[in-house]
Amino acid sequence: MEISGLVSPETLFELDVEHPATGKPVGIKVMLRSAGSEEAMKVVRRQTDGILARQQKRKVMTAEAIEENEIDQAVSYVASWDWGENTYQGETPKADAATVKRILQKEPWLYSAIVNGARDIANFTKS
């Protein structure tokens, strides 16, 4: 079997967001990038450069900074989203980075769904 090209990290995966308690679709669809995509890796490289620079200055990473890095990685996984008839605080959220970040910081269940979807290599594997 030819294994080159088996995983395609640059393709998008449509995540149908499920209710955290019932597992039923809520009507939000998120187009996810793979955690291994170039866009996501740019964020990881930038963060790693920052961590290395801090270490050279003997500065310690705070828990808040580490959490911020994790959220920023999750934001990089979101290529777009469609909220259908759903709203967030009375509005249909746009998929710009600031809005995605704000929502993921406040909604850990949605953050988890996005991270799990982006990091599941099966979602980006050709069958």
Feature locations, PLM:
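Short, intrinsically disordered N-terminal pre-domain segments
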Residues: M1-T11
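A general structural signal for short secondary-structure junctions and capping/turn motifs
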Residues: S4-L6, P20-G23, E67-E68
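Surface-exposed beta-strand edges and flanking loops
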Residues: G5, V17-H19, V30-S34
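Short acidic-hydrophobic surface loop/beta-edge motif
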Residues: T11-P25
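Short, surface-exposed, charged amphipathic helix/loop patches that serve as local interaction elements
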Residues: K24-S127
